[in-house]
Structure formats: C-alpha cells, structure tokens
Curated annotation (Swiss-Prot):
Phosphatidylserine (PS) lipase that mediates the hydrolysis of phosphatidylserine to generate lysophosphatidylserine (LPS). LPS constitutes a class of signaling lipids that regulates immunological and neurological processes. Has no activity towards diacylglycerol, triacylglycerol or lysophosphatidylserine lipase. Also has monoacylglycerol lipase activity, with preference for 1-(9Z,12Z-octadecadienoyl)-glycerol (1-LG) and 2-glyceryl-15-deoxy-Delta(12,14)-prostaglandin J2 (15d-PGJ(2)-G). The keyword Kinase does not apply. The keyword Transmembrane applies. One of its GO terms (molecular function) is phospholipase activity. This is Phosphatidylserine lipase ABHD16A. Residues 281-407 form the AB hydrolase-1 domain. Disulfide bonds: none annotated. InterPro entries: AB_hydrolase_1, AB_hydrolase_fold, ABHD16_N. GO terms for cellular component: endomembrane system; membrane. It comes from the Eukaryota.
C-alpha cells in the first residue's frame, strides 16, 4: 500500500539513461545496505514508456495544467469581463465554486488512476524505490543510480547547500538569506529631503513600477520563465539533456541558493582527458530564453573545456523567478559549487555568458575577482536603452524607473569592478541589442560596454583622440574596413606592448591605469586602437546564431 501511495505522489519519469561504464562502482567495492540495484537491460535504454492507464491519465493532467496556466495569465482580463457582465455576485460565484470543487475531485481521481498505472509498471516501481532510498541516504551509490533517470526535478534531492562551505559558516562576510550584495543605483534626486510628503507623492509611481516589473516586465525580459514556452520546449530540453548525460557523461545536480531557490545544473568533467583545456572550467550563463540543455554550453564543450551549465531561476528545473537579486543568488551558489564541491580553483574558472547572461557573469567577476577570465558574447552595457527601444516614448519615465528599481542589469558597472582579462564578442548583424536597426552597427550596445570598460581601465588613453578613433574603428562594417582603419594609424603592436608592460612593471596590475598621460595624441590613438582590438572580436552573425568553437578564444592579457 505504501508503494502504491508513493506511485500516486511520485514525480513524472521521462527517460532511463544508458548505464555508463565509467560511473559503475568498482567490483571490489561492496554495495551499501541502502543501495538499490538499477537495471542494466539494454531494452530500458530509451524514453520511459508508461502503460496505457498512466499515459492517458498523464495526458489529462497535462492538459489541465496547460488550461490552468492559460487561465492564470488571462485572469486579469477574465475578472474584468466578469465584473462588467455582473457575474461576480455571490449568487453566481457559489455555483461556480461547486463546479470547481467537482473538477478538482475528478482530477484527484485521475491522479490516483495514474498512480495505479505506475504501480503496475516494474520500471516505475524500480525508479521510485531508488528515489526513496536516495532521500533516506544520499550515498554515492544511490545518487549514481538515481542519475540514470530523468524525472521531474522538483523531487531530485539537494546536492549542495549555499552554507555548505565551512568558510561561510565561520565568517559573517558571506551572503545572508536576504541575498548577496548588489550594486544599487544612485537616487535620482540626491539633494531632495526624503520627507513623508515626498514618500507619499512617490508611492503611486512605485506601486505602478512594481506591478509592471512583476507582471509584464519580468516575462518580457525573461520569456524562458513562462510555463507555456517551457511546455512547448520540453521535448527539445529532454533531448538536449539526454545528449549531455549519455554522450558527454554530464552529471546533474540541484543547488540550494541562499534565497531558497533550487538551481538546476549540469557538469561535464574533462579533467581526465589529454586536452590541457579540460583542466579549466567554463561556467556558462544563458540568455533570456536559453537553457543549458540547448544553450551556449555546446561552444566550450566542443572546444574541449570542462563545463558547468545552469538554468536561471524559474527556467526548467530551477525554481523561483529571474529577478536580478535571485539571479545573483543563483550565480553565487553555482560558483561556490564549482570551487568547494567540484574542486576547481578560482584561477581555473572562466565565466562565459551569452546575451542577458552577461549580468550574472559580470556579477560573478565582480564578486570573485580571482576567476581566470570573462567572455561576454552578444551582451550589453545597461538594460535601460534596450527597454526604451521596445516601449512607447510616452512610457520613458515609467520604463526607466521600473528598470532601475526592479530590473537593473548594470553589466558595465559590474564589469568595471573586475581586474582580470575580458573578451567581448560583438555580433555584427545583431537584431536584439541594437537600439535602431541591425544594419546600424554603432547602435549595438556591445560598443558601449567596450567603451565603458576601456574608459575605466585606461582613462588617459581613452581621452578625446583615443575615444574618437575607437568609435571610428567600431563603425567598420567589415573586416576589410576594420583593418583599413587599423593600418591607417600605423599601429605598432610591439611598441604598444612595451609601453603597457613597462607601466605594469612600475605601477602594478590594478586598474585604472594612468598610462598615456604624457603621451602624444598619435601615441594615444595607437594604444587605444590596440586595446580595443584586443578586447573586442567581431562575429558576423545574428544574435541567436551559435558561436563556433573556433571563435571561443581566451581573452588577451599581458
């Protein structure tokens, strides 16, 4: 009876993976008493095939879930319509509640029938036995056998806790349950006294900004968190996850962040290979509709690196909602997991981000300054110009206020706090992070990210002459035109390197540098072009084109 109840309440099972020889326990090691032997039959190496009763019951419950999601998103319009028609009176609501209660009872009955179907299936009974054993005792053998199954991630046991590192338990400098530290925007009116009257005047605007951010704004910014989109992408995500596990020996793990969100991760270990880059770990930060199952992790994987992918809060197996604070909390536990559980030193970690993932990447670079390098592909400096691009001009004040208070993705500000090597990849046909049209390459916000970084690190070089010549170089629409501008100013790379190395030897590596202070205008132009070319590479493609492995290069450093 207990097993039947477990089948009724158990998670949905999607796939049973092939048994990987590299993960099997050595023959000399006896199994623990709590371990449950997983099946090795090749007939199970496929998507889980439910019996007819479970299959039909699952279809009914999935359809009900979709209808509930549609009802949730359309509820404001539905309530408005019902109110206008006078259907929200007590005499109309009571019968409706009876219908809703009856429907819930019917769905509960369908769930019980699904449980009976699972109970009659030996594959599911074997799976639920392993899952229960793992929850009782998270031994390495139980977790190894559980990894052979792909199921609803909500039932996956937590593998790593944000407080697990001993250094955080002993010190008070780590994150609290309220979250990690973020850079906050400065008040718009610093000289205005924050009186009670001013607070009351601001209250309607603050309420409006909050509602916009938590309804339309968040879903526009992170469409991957919308349930209906995830439901449509589920087959693709399952296929991508199977590829990572079966072909790349990926290991899935659930991390618990300081805000209580559970973060879905996938780790591919290449340290045992002959390739030297396998000793380096690339932490991948996906875009606003990207998932590690089908996202940018493929680029460093093809290049031979060890890779750690993770999903934003609210994406696929990760819980929560993707607001900046939750995003930073998630990134923090991912980096901690890489250091304290996977055993990588910060000097062996590379942060790689695509598009909106630049926010968490730059936050990690700012918060963990010892990481080896940062690579930002198709990213931007600040969210406000991009948000204003897609909203009406009459909403400018509301959009700016909402972004600054609730969705402040200040990539450039965070990146300037990092002292290590940085590489920016600009898509020359990018249609997403341009503020006008894709053909107008100067409206690409990656340009502004580069300029802000160089102006912070080399303020004397990026004075009038240097800034002007870098802008000309950024306007180049082809490699030929770019090379023409570079050669027009006769940039001597050996001279530029000697100047920078001499300054570093005398003054140390910490930015900002005052190099170029006593330099001629021609020298500043040469140095500015040299630095711009080292920090930004062009890739002739649109925003969503996968980055080829040969374009995944380590940033330049002295």
């Amino acid at each position: 009876m207990a097993k039947l109840l477990s089948c009724v309440l158990g998670p949905r099972l999607y796939k049973i993976y092939r048994e990987r020889d590299s993960e099997r326990a050595p023959a000399s090691v006896p199994e623990t008493p709590t371990a449950v032997t997983a099946p090795h039959s090749s007939s199970w190496d496929t998507y889980y095939q439910p019996r007819a009763l479970e299959k039909h019951a699952d279809s009914i419950l999935a359809l009900a879930s979709v209808f509930w999601s549609i009802s949730y998103y359309s509820s404001p319009f539905a309530f408005f319509y019902l109110y206008r028609k006078g259907y929200l009176s007590l005499s109309k609501v009571v019968p409706f509640s009876h219908y809703a209660g009856t429907l819930l009872l019917l769905l509960a009955g369908v769930a019980c029938l699904r449980g009976i179907g699972r109970w009659t299936n030996p594959q599911y009974r074997q799976f639920i036995t392993i899952l229960e054993a793992t929850h009782r005792n998270q031994s390495s053998e139980n977790k190894r056998q559980l990894a052979n199954y792909n199921f609803d991630f909500r039932s996956w046991p937590v593998d790593f806790h944000w407080e697990e590192p001993s250094s955080r338990k002993e010190s008070r400098g780590g994150p609290s349950r309220q979250g990690v530290a973020l850079l906050r925007p400065e008040p718009l009116h610093r000289g205005t006294a924050d009186t009670l009257l001013n607070r009351v005047k601001k209250l309607p605007c603050q309420i409006t900004s909050y509602l916009v951010a938590h309804t339309l704004g968040r879903r526009m910014l992170y469409p991957g968190s919308v349930y209906l989109l995830q439901k449509a992408l589920m087959p693709v995500l399952l296929q991508g996850q199977a590829r990572l596990v079966e072909e790349c020996n990926g290991r899935r793990a659930k991390l618990l962040a300081c805000d209580g969100n559970e973060i879905d991760t996938m780790f591919v270990d290449r340290r045992g290979t002959a390739e030297p880059q396998g000793q380096k770990l690339v932490i991948c930060c996906e875009g606003n509709a990207g998932f590690y199952e089908v996202g940018c992790v493929s680029t460093p994987l093809e290049a031979g690196y060890s890779v750690l992918g993770w999903n934003h809060p609210g994406f696929a197996g990760s819980t929560g909602v993707p607001f900046p604070q939750n995003e930073a909390n998630a990134m923090d536990v991912v980096v901690q997991f890489a250091i304290h559980r996977l055993g990588f030193q910060p000097q062996d970690i590379i942060i790689y981000a695509w598009s909106i993932g630049g926010f968490t990447a730059t936050w990690a670079a700012m918060s963990y300054p010892d990481v080896s390098a940062v690579i930002l592909d198709a990213s931007f400096d600040d969210l406000v110009p991009l948000a204003l691009k897609v909203m009406p001009d009459s909403w400018r004040g509301l959009v700016t206020r909402t972004v600054r208070q609730h969705l402040n993705l200040n990539n450039a500000e965070q990146l300037c706090r990092y002292q290590g090597p940085v590489l920016l990849i600009r898509r020359t046909k990018d249609e997403i992070i341009t503020t006008t049209v894709p053909e107008d390459i100067m409206s690409n916000r990656g340009n502004d990210l580069l300029l802000k970084l160089l102006q912070h690190r080399y303020p004397r070089v990026m004075a009038e002459e240097g800034l002007r010549v870098v802008r000309q170089w950024l306007e180049a629409s082809s490699q030929l035109e770019e090379a023409s501008i570079y050669s027009r100013w006769e940039v001597e790379e050996d001279w530029c390197l000697s100047v920078l190395r001499s300054y570093q030897a005398e003054h140390g590596p910490d930015f900002p540098w005052s190099v170029g202070e006593d330099m001629s205008a021609d020298g500043r132009r040469q140095l500015a072009l040299f630095l711009a070319r080292k920090h930004l590479h062009n890739f002739e493609a649109t925003h969503c084109t996968p980055l080829p492995a040969q374009n995944f290069q380590m940033p330049w450093h002295l």
